[in-house]
């Protein structure tokens, strides 16, 4: 194995010092639409349904959607110009949080890096589910919003139905952060807090320019687990980390 390959492997397989379990409540402030495939929808179904858990049929927010949105917002905030860089050319701070593949989109070699952040699919909180299932909604725990586009030349209308998660719904938010270098935890948490702040000033899902997908984050908590150093982070320090993340949210 070459020195370069060994160096790459070391970067990909950094020592795991511990884990931070980050939790919060994500509240839907305006109707949310993260689309699911409608290729096999029955006649009379909604034109554009939202993504659901296949077992419970409840709406979910895919972890991939949240990860992609946070990363894109952070990269856009750091980039001058209109063209975003290839993922392999993201800043070191972004790459260590979100990871980077060995090959870029152009097929060229990049510096592969394992993501320190592990995302989860967000599911409705139990209290929110109990509240929403009692409402008379157009679909199961969903509302229908009619949208329309008008052809400027022919004046022909193109109405369609968009399924949304109703405003007021709350999801259980969770991230796990891998501690690899203790001296980088504060910087990583500050960057994550910036991303969460940007998210709440932007939108999640589709049709954001029309007012969809505004969200807020509340009630951050952080817990710590480590086999090698179980007492390395005090509760006071964990509360400080939660406060840093909450600067992008709102405390309640």
Question: PLM features: residue spans?
Answer:
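RNA-binding basic/glycine-rich loop and surface signature characteristic of RAMP-family CRISPR effectors
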Residues: 2-149, 154-252
């Amino acid at each position: 194995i070459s020195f370069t390959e060994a160096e790459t492997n070391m970067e990909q397989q950094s020592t795991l010092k511990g884990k931070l379990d980050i939790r919060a409540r994500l509240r839907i402030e305006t109707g949310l639409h993260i689309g699911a495939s409608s290729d096999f929808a029955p006649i009379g179904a909604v034109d554009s349904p939202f993504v659901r858990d296949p077992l419970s049929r409840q709406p979910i927010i895919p972890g991939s959607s949240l990860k992609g949105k946070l990363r894109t917002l952070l990269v856009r905030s750091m980039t001058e110009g209109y063209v975003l860089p290839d993922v392999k050319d993201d800043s070191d701070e972004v790459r260590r949080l979100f990871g980077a593949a060995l090959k870029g989109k152009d097929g060229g070699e990049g510096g592969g890096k394992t993501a320190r952040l592990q995302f989860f699919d967000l599911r409705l909180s139990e209290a929110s589910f109990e509240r929403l299932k009692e409402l008379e909604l157009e679909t199961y725990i969903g509302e229908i919003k009619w949208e329309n586009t008008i052809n400027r030349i022919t004046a022909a209308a193109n109405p369609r139905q968009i399924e949304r998660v109703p405003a007021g719904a709350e999801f259980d938010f969770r991230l796990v952060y891998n501690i690899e270098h203790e001296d980088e935890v504060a910087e990583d948490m500050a960057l994550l807090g910036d991303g969460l702040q940007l998210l709440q000033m932007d939108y999640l899902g589709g049709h954001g320019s029309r007012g969809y997908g505004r969200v807020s984050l509340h009630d951050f908590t952080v817990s710590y687990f480590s086999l090698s150093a179980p007492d390395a982070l005090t509760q006071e320090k964990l509360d400080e980390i939660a406060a840093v993340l909450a600067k992008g949210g709102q405390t309640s």
